[in-house]
């Protein structure tokens, strides 16, 4: 684009004009430039300040503070986009005040410090009220007005004492990943918070309220894993250990039932007793399509179940991460220089529910039996956007026929390698392929090994 090209900026009910030479070094504006136009939903006075700053005018400290989120002048500040309105806020404040942003910034860390390309589809009016509540935390009327919004951003009123997480809340929090139970260590996302009731009993609630269920006698479950919490009314656990948990697996022609005592679950490290909170936590892995769990409980306490619903939403918190390693063979039937592989074929080998998860490929290896064959580069090609990335390959020190992707030069900041299938679905409606440019033609099998992890997420 020529430096003299006129750029039209529409902001609320105001209209501005400038030239491309003025804005070309401002990523905030150029990233929103479409057909010589920029449309914004921010305070027009901020754009006036910004354009004057870009034109070389000296602004006072107050004006600079107002446009800081557009020119990155403040340390440790990030830009977020809530409902189309941009905020430039201190990272530590956000992550400590609203736990939602801890996971949000971690998941989108490749965008740091400008996260505005990821729309947080919530009301910015309500978000303004949340920021106001931070300054007036004793305003009960305001709290009741924005209570639902605070719950979405994972804010708990009892967490804060002068904007700091209280020691009492820390003491009452249980991080399941810290418990001595083998399977639960994979559940990084689960955190149960204790809450005192009027009767003095402690009730455990999940921070993901929509995925929290009360357990009533029996329930059909169709999820791979289920967390069962047992809150004991008394301190005596001996009677409970002899209770029987019945797993009824339903098949077409017969029903198979397996009975196991809670004591056996303890021995197999499927369950753990949290003595300090008088709580039993069980991690049950269910691989059958339909299964009924009958819990024989004898009124010893309250039983709750928690299980993930595997629906993808990049703006919500992580559910869990599963790491796997897979080997897939591609057969080259003819002498060719370019090997072409559709990434969605990879995913179909992994699961039939790929649209419900994010798959991130941590490492991809290529093993070519022919010692004389090597790879020049790898390209990631989209049917809609063309060449997205180009990579060099690094041969293995132990196996000269084994190649690993070393680095990629990313053309689009929203596509990153490791390959993120969530991004693949957004950026390629038809296909997304990997091209391997070989130095010599091959007529052989190429083994492709890839290590990946799955991130299942909540609504």
Curated annotation (Swiss-Prot):
GO terms for biological process: protein homooligomerization. InterPro entries: BTB/POZ_dom, SKP1/BTB/POZ_sf, T1-type_BTB. PROSITE patterns: BTB. SUPFAM superfamilies: POZ domain. Residues 76-143 form the BTB domain. Signal peptide: none annotated. Gene3D superfamilies: Potassium Channel Kv1.1, Chain A (3.30.710.10). It comes from the Viruses. Belongs to the mimivirus BTB/WD family. This is Putative BTB/POZ domain-containing protein R541.
């Amino acid at each position: 684009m020529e430096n003299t090209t006129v750029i039209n900026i529409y902001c609320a009910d105001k209209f501005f004009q400038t030239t491309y030479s003025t804005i070309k070094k401002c990523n905030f504006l150029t990233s929103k430039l479409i057909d010589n136009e920029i449309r914004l939903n921010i305070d027009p006075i901020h754009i006036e300040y910004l354009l004057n700053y870009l034109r070389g005018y000296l602004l006072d400290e107050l004006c600079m503070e107002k446009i800081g989120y557009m020119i990155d002048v403040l340390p440790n500040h990030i830009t977020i986009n809530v409902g189309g309105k941009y905020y430039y806020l201190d990272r530590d404040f956000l992550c400590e005040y609203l736990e939602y942003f801890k996971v949000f910034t971690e998941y989108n860390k490749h965008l740091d410090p400008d996260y505005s390309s990821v729309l947080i589809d919530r009301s910015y009016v309500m978000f303004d009220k949340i920021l106001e509540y931070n300054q007036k935390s004793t305003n009960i009327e305001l709290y009741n007005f924005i209570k639902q919004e605070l719950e979405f951003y994972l804010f708990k009123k009892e967490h804060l004492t002068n904007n700091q997480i209280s020691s009492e809340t820390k003491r009452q929090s249980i991080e399941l990943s810290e418990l001595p139970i083998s399977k639960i260590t994979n559940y990084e996302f689960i955190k149960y918070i204790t809450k005192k009731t009027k009767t003095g009993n402690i009730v455990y609630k999940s921070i993901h309220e929509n995925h929290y269920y009360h357990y009533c006698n029996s329930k059909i479950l169709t999820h791979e894993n289920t967390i069962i919490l047992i809150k004991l009314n008394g301190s005596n656990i001996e009677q409970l250990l002899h209770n029987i948990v019945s797993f009824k697996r339903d098949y077409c022609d017969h029903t198979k039932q397996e009975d196991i005592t809670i004591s056996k679950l303890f021995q197999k490290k499927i369950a753990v007793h949290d003595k300090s909170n008088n709580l039993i936590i069980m991690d049950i892995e269910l691989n059958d399509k339909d299964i009924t769990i009958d819990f024989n409980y004898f009124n010893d306490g309250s039983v709750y179940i928690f299980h993930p619903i595997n629906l993808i939403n990049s703006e919500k918190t992580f559910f869990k991460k599963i790491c796997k390693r897979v080997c897939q063979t591609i057969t080259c039937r003819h002498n060719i220089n370019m090997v072409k592989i559709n990434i969605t074929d990879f995913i179909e080998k992994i699961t039939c529910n790929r649209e419900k998860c994010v798959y991130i490929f941590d490492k991809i290896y290529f093993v070519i039996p022919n010692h004389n064959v090597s790879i020049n580069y790898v390209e990631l090609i989209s049917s809609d956007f063309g060449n997205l990335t180009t990579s060099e390959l690094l041969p293995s020190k132990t196996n000269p026929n084994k190649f690993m992707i070393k680095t990629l030069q990313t053309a689009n900041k929203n596509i990153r390698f490791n390959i993120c299938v969530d991004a693949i679905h957004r950026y390629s409606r038809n296909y997304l392929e990997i091209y391997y440019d070989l130095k010599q033609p091959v007529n052989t099998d190429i083994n492709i090994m890839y290590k990946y992890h799955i991130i299942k997420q909540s609504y």
